[in-house]
Regions:
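Bacterial N-terminal signal peptides
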Residues: 2-12
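Cleavable N-terminal signal peptides
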Residues: 5, 15-16, 161
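A metal-dependent hydrolase signature that marks the N-terminal structural subdomain at the beginning
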Residues: 17-107, 114-115, 249-252, 256-280
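Pan-zinc metallopeptidase signature
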Residues: 20-23, 194-280
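Soluble non-cytosolic domains of exported or imported proteins
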Residues: 45-53, 119-132, 148-155
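Short alpha-helix carrying the canonical HExxH Zn2+-binding catalytic motif
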Residues: 109, 125-142
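An active-site-proximal "capping" alpha-helix that borders the catalytic cofactor pocket
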Residues: 150-169
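Active-site/pore-lining binding-face segments in mid-to-C-terminal subdomains
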Residues: 166-216
Length: 280
């Protein structure tokens, strides 16, 4: 996961060029492209992603997956920040989404507070883009492996993304979770659309914190309710009490439906040994 997170720092350094990952580690069934945007203002975001080899590093991250068919992932102009994944279509990282994340992030050198956590621009950039890519890849995998999903597929994909983020290093988990939480919290004022297939951003915020807190109660303790009544950003104690049970169910389903039948363990162990933030 850290390779993807480190790659996504592209949005903060437009002229930086990262080291290209070795071709031998890539998943050959993951095809990528950076489509030229029609809008001139979005060209810089394409360049940033290309300079950091973001999609090439996603190919490496997905290398342990034994895919049954081709998975196309592309960066493109969409007209909107996010295009919902549909069966058989490419996974798309929209330049408009990268631009929105960039605009909502703290300025360079600025540190902001989210509850008891301090948040840097780096974390605010890495988190939501990593989460979105993992979410949409999860949707594609649901279809590819014909996995049964009880309830909303969007909620299930959020859970897979969150579970993935918290199951690598503590540093990676912190950056991606806190950054995603910041981005979701910034959208709380969006009107509730009860016809939307995605949960409201406030629900997604607390679902993410629930997974994170259950995975590491020490690292994410600062998001837990501190006083007699929870503040707006805090995970209520009543909800936290159910998080461990929910996480156990999530872990069991992930292992039985994705990891055990579809992941190449030697490749996975090789992936985990890499020091992503330094190596790439």
């Amino acid at each position: 996961m850290g390779v993807l997170a480190s790659a996504l720092l592209a949005v903060q350094a437009p002229v930086a060029v990262a080291q290209k990952p070795p071709d031998g580690l890539k998943n050959p069934l993951v095809e990528i492209s950076y489509e030229p945007p029609r809008t001139a203002a979005l060209a810089e975001f394409r360049a940033r992603l290309q300079n950091r080899y973001v999609l090439e590093k996603l190919q490496v991250f997905l290398s342990p997956l034994n895919l049954t068919e081709r998975l196309v992932v592309k960066a493109d102009e969409c007209g909107v920040p996010h295009v919902l994944y549909t069966r058989g279509a490419p996974v798309v990282l929209c330049y408009e989404y990268v631009a929105k994340v960039d605009a909502d992030a703290p300025r360079i050198g600025q540190v902001v507070q989210l509850g008891q956590a301090e948040l840097t621009r780096e974390e605010a950039l890495v988190g939501p883009i990593t989460q979105l890519v993992l979410h949409d890849v999860a949707r594609a995998i649901f279809h590819m492996y014909k996995l049964p999903v009880w309830g909303g597929a969007e909620f299930a994909a959020d859970n897979v993304a969150a579970y993935t983020m918290v199951n690598f290093s503590q540093k990676t988990a912190w950056k991606t979770v806190v950054g995603t939480a910041w981005f979701l919290k910034s959208g709380w004022d969006r009107p509730v659309d009860i016809s939307d297939i995605r949960p409201h951003v406030a629900q997604r915020y607390f679902a993410l914190l629930c997974v994170a807190y259950a995975a590491d109660q020490v690292q994410f303790e600062g998001f837990l309710q501190q006083g007699p009544k929870p503040k707006v950003y805090e995970l209520p104690v009543e909800r936290a009490n159910t998080c461990l049970y929910d996480y156990e169910k999530l872990s069991t389903s992930f292992m039985k439906t994705i990891f055990e039948p579809h992941v190449d363990r030697p490749k996975f162990e090789q992936l985990r040994k890499l020091e992503w933030l330094k190596d790439f």
